[in-house]
Amino acid sequence: MEEAVGELSARERDILRLVADGHTNEEIGEKVDLSALTVKSHLARITRKLGTGDRAHMVALGIRSGVIN
């Protein structure tokens, strides 16, 4: 699964980092100038690419792969 992190787009990586910082979808949207619904769509794609079921697992994979430090 950690290899799958390499398949994330730059935007998806940015969103993953903001999730790791504890931001809500609305807060992430404000920071990257997207709607909360678009952020939710990005998170769904990240979840699918990584095969994760929740934000905590998504963040753990990001940390282990070095995307999040």
Predicted features and spans:
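Short helix-to-turn junction characteristic of helix-turn-helix DNA-binding domains
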Residues: 19-23, 62
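Regulatory hinge/linker segments at domain boundaries
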Residues: 1-14
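Short alpha-helical "packing" element that flanks the helix-turn-helix/winged-helix DNA-binding module
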Residues: 12-15, 19, 58
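Recognition helix of helix-turn-helix DNA-binding domains
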Residues: 24-57
